[in-house]
């Protein structure tokens, strides 16, 4: 979400904008987010509104909010809708206390109301849009920066999980853990893999050891979202070529989406 907003801010300064806000336009390369959909770029037209706002909320903001406010992991919800979490649905889930926030009220409650009006009377909506006043570029920029500031402060609540605190709760004593670290380090030094896949990466401890000892790239996989989040923090903090993926190998994601 932050990467997308940073890119939007960068583009707007160059008088360009994005046509949409799909989360799938961002992939990861060497552990870092990269925007890949060049065809989404277009020239900024004076007074235009953010066309991808609704999609940004569904793909980025709403999944973060449902984790921050309701402690619900969003990952499996994307199976039901790869376009993300519907704003009208999120508005129904949130309670009155959640909605007191100015940001939540603005981006969820009000937007939900407008979307429902669009559904009830689409002709009137088209007419209103044609009569809208121009949206100043300064207002456009302020909206992007305000969203970035808010989102950067959101913290996802972590449920208790099996491997979320792997460093504290595992089957190794100090000696056996040290032996395993040496075995992994020696193996990686000998093989020198271009790409290594760590299945059941836990907190990413051995993924990092692999990179430190010669693996050029590591893909770390686990079904525990807390473990994956911790691994990503390690990757980000140490600037590693490490990509953590939330995957349950006993219940893999189906082949779905465009042309599937």
Q: Where are the predicted features?
A:
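Catalytic activation segment of kinase domains across protein kinase-like and atypical kinase folds
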Residues: 17, 22-68
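N-terminal auxiliary segments of SAM/dcSAM-dependent transferases
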Residues: 54-153
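Conserved SAM-binding loop and adjacent beta-strand
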Residues: 154, 168-183
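Conserved class I S-adenosyl-L-methionine
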Residues: 192-202
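Conserved SAM-binding loop of SAM-dependent methyltransferases across substrates and taxa
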Residues: 203-215
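Conserved SAM-binding motif I beta-strand of class I
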Residues: 217-222
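Short alpha-helix immediately C-terminal to the canonical SAM-binding loop
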Residues: 228-229
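S-adenosyl-L-methionine
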Residues: 232-260
């Amino acid at each position: 979400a932050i990467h997308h907003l940073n890119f939007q801010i960068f583009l707007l300064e160059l008088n360009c904008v994005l046509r949409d806000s799909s989360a799938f336009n961002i992939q990861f390369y060497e552990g870092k987010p990269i925007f890949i959909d060049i065809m989404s770029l277009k020239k900024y037209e004076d007074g235009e509104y953010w066309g991808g706002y609704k999609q940004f909320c569904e793909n980025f903001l709403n999944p973060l909010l449902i984790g921050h406010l309701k402690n619900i992991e969003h990952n499996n919800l994307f199976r039901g809708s790869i376009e993300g979490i519907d704003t009208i649905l999120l508005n129904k889930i949130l309670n009155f206390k959640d909605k007191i926030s100015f940001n939540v009220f603005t981006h969820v409650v009000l937007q939900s109301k407008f979307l429902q009006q669009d559904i009830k009377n689409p002709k009137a909506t088209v007419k209103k849009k044609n009569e809208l006043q121009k949206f100043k570029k300064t207002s456009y920029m302020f909206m992007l920066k305000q969203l970035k500031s808010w989102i950067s402060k959101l913290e996802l609540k972590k449920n208790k999980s099996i491997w979320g605190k792997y460093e504290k709760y595992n089957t190794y004593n100090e000696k056996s853990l040290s032996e395993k670290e040496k075995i992994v380090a020696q193996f990686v030094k000998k093989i020198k893999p271009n790409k290594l896949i760590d299945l059941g990466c836990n907190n990413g401890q051995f993924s990092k050891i692999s990179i430190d000892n010669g693996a050029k790239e590591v893909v770390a996989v686990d079904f525990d979202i807390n473990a994956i989040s911790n691994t990503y923090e390690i990757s980000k903090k140490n600037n590693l070529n490490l990509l953590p993926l939330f995957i349950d190998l006993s219940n893999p994601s189906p082949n779905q989406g465009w042309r599937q």
